Amino acid sequence: MPQTPPRSGGYRSGKQSYVDESLFGGSKRTGAAQVETLDSLKLTAPTRTISPKDRDVVTLTKGDLTRMLKASPIMTAEDVAAAKREAEAKREQLQAVSKARKEKMLKLEEEAKKQAPPTETEILQRQLNDATRSRATHMMLEQKDPVKHMNQMMLYSKCVTIRDAQIEEKKQMLAEEEEEQRRLDLMMEIERVKALEQYEARERQRVEERRKGAAVLSEQIKERERERIRQEELRDQERLQMLREIERLKEEEMQAQIEKKIQAKQLMEEVAAANSEQIKRKEGMKVREKEEDLRIADYILQKEMREQSLAAEKERIAKEKEMETARLRAMQERAADKQSELDELRARRYQEAKEREWRQKERAYAERQASMQQELANARTAQQASKLKQKAEMARLEHDEFMRVLDVNRAKEYDELQQTVNAMTLNSKYKEELLAQIQANEERRKRERSHYLEEGARLREAAEKERQLLLQIKDRKLGELESAGVPGKYRAELEKMKIRS
């Protein structure tokens, strides 16, 4: 932000302009006039401010050299004051003579120009001289302290106008940045809510899949129970059929061989005992099947070891059945004739076929259960791995986003710190330059004030003319500021500026 320049009239000093006197009159001068002009320049030389370019150059006249070679007289303060007054009077006298001579020459030249028509070259030269004089006059006016002060005020007014525009632009940029930050925060919140919704949807889907899997599993258990009941009914029907067949054989045997009643009775008793034993085995089988169902339900949640035990148990039952069947067959062979043997053989083969079919179904069912359990275990393992992978991915994304926001904030803080340090450095440098300028201006103003006091009444008339000129310049510069669009509050200081004579 530009700092407000001092309002105490401080300004940078520039080298004074010197105008070629030949621009104001004829080009020919007498030798005496040239000598007087040189003498006038010698007397006025102490009052001229040396420009920075001329500080290393010293011009000595013959009189100065002679004076420097002479012995330095010891002068009192009164002698110094008297010498200054004498030199001042002589200088004023020479200036008056030179001015009168210049006015006379200008008047003669004007009369001569009026009598003789100007040539084209003279017209061009006059235009060039007028432009040069106008430029020189403008430069001389611009070197005046009040005009420099006005220029400083104009520069300050333009600077603060630009500063206000920059401040307004900065406010707008900050507002846009805040709006953009709010938009980014809203987008991040929306993304976070979407991620949560997706996670909840996946959780709901997972729960639904588990529920469906449990329902399918329950339905399979029910289906197996129905299949077991159906198989049990089939086995009961087969047993009833076998009993009927045995009864038929017994009746035929009683009709055909009355003499074998005792043997038949014994056979019936043996069959009854066998039936009783088979009923007991059936009840035991039911108990074992119930236990087997419980083991299957528990096996769904545990391992495959129980299936092997179940297979061994079934194998043992099958062997017992085969042994019992062989025993019955031996008994029937002893009690029946050839036809009975054939019928018994057919019944035994039928029973063995049914037993083999039952064992194959049991084995296929066990294999299906094992395959289903393996698939469930694989699905559960894959689901857990997917869930862990998803959590790891979400954690990685959150960490990346956090590090990105942290890097952006650090970069922004570093930029703001650099801007603050640069601004402080510029302000400090500007302050030092301004203080040096103020001090230099203060010293220069003291010197100029001393010079103004020495000039006294002789310069009052010129000061009044200059005041009027400065007022015109002030009005012109106010018009320039108004045309440049500078607000009235920044033109007020220049408007209030008082032009003192």
UniProtKB/Swiss-Prot annotation:
<dbReference type="GO" id="GO:0031514">
    <property type="term" value="C:motile cilium"/>
</dbReference>
<keyword id="KW-0969">Cilium</keyword>
<dbReference type="InterPro" id="IPR043597">
    <property type="entry name" value="TPH_dom"/>
</dbReference>
<feature type="coiled-coil region">
    <location>
        <begin position="75"/>
        <end position="114"/>
    </location>
</feature>
<dbReference type="Pfam" id="PF13868">
    <property type="entry name" value="TPH"/>
</dbReference>
<protein>
    <recommendedName>
        <fullName>Cilia- and flagella-associated protein 45</fullName>
    </recommendedName>
</protein>
<comment type="similarity">
    <text>Belongs to the CFAP45 family.</text>
</comment>
<keyword id="KW-0966">Cell projection</keyword>
<keyword id="KW-0282">Flagellum</keyword>
<keyword id="KW-0175">Coiled coil</keyword>
<dbReference type="InterPro" id="IPR033253">
    <property type="entry name" value="CFAP45"/>
</dbReference>
